[in-house]
Swiss-Prot record:
Gene assigned in the entry: Rab18
GO molecular function ontology, one term from the record: GTP binding
Species of the source: Rattus norvegicus
In-chain residues carrying the UniProt-annotated modification Cysteine methyl ester: C203
Regulation acting on activity, per entry: Regulated by guanine nucleotide exchange factors (GEFs) which promote the exchange of bound GDP for free GTP. Regulated by GTPase activating proteins (GAPs) which increase the GTP hydrolysis activity at the ER membrane. Inhibited by GDP dissociation inhibitors (GDIs) which prevent Rab-GDP dissociation.
Disulfide bridges in this chain: none
Top-level taxon in the UniProt lineage: Eukaryota
Keyword Transmembrane helix: no
UniProt name for this protein: Ras-related protein Rab-18
Binding site for Mg(2+): S22, T40
């Protein structure tokens, strides 16, 4: 059934409680939005297969609770991850200020040095913005992260965030190939231009 799947990737979604991590995941996997979505208790987990530049990848996406009382789950949660989506709420500056704490945690527990990180400023559909787009971009550049602003409510930027993350992982030698070396898998020729396609207006590849 999965013969044409290039690889399976472990993706994490992290960030403060209430920034919309679960809503982003639900929009990406099920294309739905629930404004009354309850806070995640512990860890949620979803699987979705996507195609990027002609390469099919199965994503095992882990969504964690942002609350401090669930941090005991942290070490096993980070283990073996190839990509991380770090989310903040553009209408809550405190969630942006605390990004450094999440990066420190990532550095402490992540088992790979070449993990690909994507910074997502969520809830751009709201008017009471407290974090400017350029602030997010500057933070992402400082920490060598991909960056995008998105809205789980309107779907803006959501698909692009996951596609760009997966594309970057597939382009990173050693992140996924070792488990596939004996399967004879080959990359499809990737598109040379990062600026084209549906994501051109959103993502900054850093």
């Amino acid at each position: 059934m999965d013969e044409d799947v290039l690889t399976t990737l472990k993706i994490l979604i992290i960030g403060e409680s209430g920034v919309g991590k679960s809503s982003l995941l639900l929009r990406f996997t099920d294309d739905t939005f629930d404004p009354e979505l309850a806070a995640t208790i512990g860890v949620d987990f979803k699987v979705k297969t996507i195609s990027v530049d002609g390469n099919k990848a199965k994503l095992a996406i882990w969504d964690t609770a942002g609350q401090e009382r669930f941090r005991t789950l942290t070490p096993s949660y980070y283990r073996g991850a190839q990509g991380v989506i770090l989310v903040y709420d553009v209408t809550r500056r405190d969630t942006f200020v605390k990004l450094d704490n999440w990066l420190n945690e990532l550095e402490t527990y992540c088992t790979r040095n070449d993990i690909v990180n994507m910074l997502v400023g969520n809830k751009i559909d709201k008017e009471n913005r407290e974090v400017d787009r350029n602030e997010g971009l500057k933070f992402a550049r400082k920490h060598s992260m991909l960056f995008i602003e998105a809205s789980a409510k309107t779907c803006d930027g959501v698909q692009c965030a996951f596609e760009e993350l997966v594309e970057k992982i597939i382009q990173t030698p050693g992140l996924w190939e070792s488990e596939n070396q004996n399967k004879g898998v080959k990359l499809s020729p990737r598109e040379e231009s990062h600026g084209g396609g549906a994501c051109g207006g959103y993502c900054s590849v850093l």
